[in-house]
């Protein structure tokens, strides 16, 4: 489970406690977010991505990215309309449109292609899915860096997506939850960096991973003013926003030095290195991700072809025989079959322990005798 074990920055927790002691904050807040927080989001986007946002009409606070995304689908889609969702995917991306009565067309991700080839094939499949669906889809849902596959894309990729969306009158919703958990020489862009993107796109940004504030339920939807105002109107009937002290603490987080975020990402980078290199040493070759807090691993062929295991059976095997919990790929859709997802939410000693457990479990099955 992608539930960070790293605590939030101490100064953010201190601010929460300080404000929570004040009597006047214990009441309903604003569903759209207090003005200072929306301004802090706009300033953060300017510094981080070079994107200009109007705090009044292009920024809204959401009670976590899942809530924001789900209600955005409710604000955008009606029965009989269709969303395109790449798969495998974070489950709510696929099911929120269905919950609101819309249809979903899956776009299988070409997971094993390198970035340039991935971009070309993704766009080819997007064109194919869009044009083979009648009436044409209304929304494209994307998320890069991607959960669970850890796929990353360039700004050029977003340019092509926006170009396609404008040409075909398609809305784009981009979940940018892992924008700040990146490694090596890669820096994830925002889709709103594309000129004219706000004409067709909304982006979700969360503090859960960037500031290790999972459970605080603080996220934002930013971008197209029509969609943001529709979401504001909908949420005004549904909720009273996030507890005010949490909003004030979020302001402090967003206004802090970016090194705070990078220090959190460096912890995940070290864990990534230990896990991927450890798996490689025991004969399980896994691609090293450039972003997210996950490792997406293809199950060795010995287990799928010789032992006949699917991803759920293999996950149970690792749990019972190695004492290691992973997410079966099928849990992210049928296109995730044959893969498992590791979450980098344990320290380096625990990761080393996990590698030893997996090696022992592999040995019991005859994996190494078979040349694994």
Question: What feature does the model see in each segment?
Answer:
Residues 1-64, 71, 125, 253-256, ...:
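N-terminal small-domain helix-loop-helix segment of the aminotransferase-like
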Residues 75-97, 124, 128:
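Conserved PLP-anchoring active-site segment centered on the Schiff-base-forming lysine
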Residues 100, 167-168, 282, 322:
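Helix C-cap/helix->beta junction micro-motif
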Residues 109-184:
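Active-site phosphate-binding strand-loop segment of PLP-dependent enzymes
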Residues 127-128, 305-309, 317-326, 331-372:
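PLP-dependent enzyme catalytic core of the Aspartate aminotransferase-like
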Residues 193-194, 198-269, 273-282, 361-362:
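Conserved core segment of the aminotransferase class I/II
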Residues 251, 266-276, 286-300, 336:
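Conserved glycine-rich beta-strand-loop-beta hairpin in the small C-terminal domain of fold type I
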């Amino acid at each position: 489970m992608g539930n960070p074990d790293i605590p939030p920055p101490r100064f953010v927790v201190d601010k929460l406690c300080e404000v929570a002691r004040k009597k006047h904050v214990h009441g309903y807040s604003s569903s759209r977010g207090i003005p200072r927080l929306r301004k802090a989001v706009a300033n953060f986007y300017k510094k981080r991505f070079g994107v200009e946002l109007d705090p009044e009409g292009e920024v809204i606070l959401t009670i976590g990215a899942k809530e924001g995304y789900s209600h955005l689908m409710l604000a955008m889609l009606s029965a009989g309309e269709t969303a395109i969702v790449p798969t495998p995917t974070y489950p709510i991306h696929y099911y929120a449109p269905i919950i609101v009565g819309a249809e979903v067309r899956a776009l299988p991700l070409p997971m094993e292609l390198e970035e340039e080839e991935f971009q070309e094939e993704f766009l080819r499949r997007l064109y194919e899915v869009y044009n083979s669906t009648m009436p044409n889809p209304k929304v494209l849902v994307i998320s890069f860096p991607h959960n669970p596959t850890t796929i990353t894309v360039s700004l050029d990729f977003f340019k092509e997506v926006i170009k396609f969306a404008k040409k075909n009158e398609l809305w784009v919703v981009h979940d940018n939850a892992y924008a700040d958990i990146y490694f090596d020489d890669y820096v994830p862009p925002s889709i709103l960096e594309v000129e004219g993107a706000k004409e067709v796109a909304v982006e979700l940004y969360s503090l859960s991973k960037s500031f290790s504030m999972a459970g605080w339920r603080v996220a934002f939807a930013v971008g197209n003013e029509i969609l943001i105002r529709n979401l504001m109107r909908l949420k005004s009937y549904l909720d009273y926003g996030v507890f005010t002290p949490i909003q004030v603490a979020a302001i402090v987080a967003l206004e802090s030095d970016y090194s705070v975020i990078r220090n959190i990402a460096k912890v995940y980078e070290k864990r990534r290195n230990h896990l991927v290199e450890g798996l490689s040493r025991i004969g399980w070759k896994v691609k090293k991700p450039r972003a997210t807090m996950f490792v997406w691993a293809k199950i060795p062929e010995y287990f799928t072809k010789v032992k006949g295991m699917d991803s759920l059976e293999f996950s149970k095997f690792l749990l019972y025989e190695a004492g290691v919990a992973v997410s079966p790929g099928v849990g992210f859709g049928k296109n995730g079959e044959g893969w498992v997802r590791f979450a980098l939410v344990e320290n380096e000693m625990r990761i080393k322990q996990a590698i030893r457990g997996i090696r022992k479990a592999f040995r019991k099955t005859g994996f190494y005798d078979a040349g694994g």
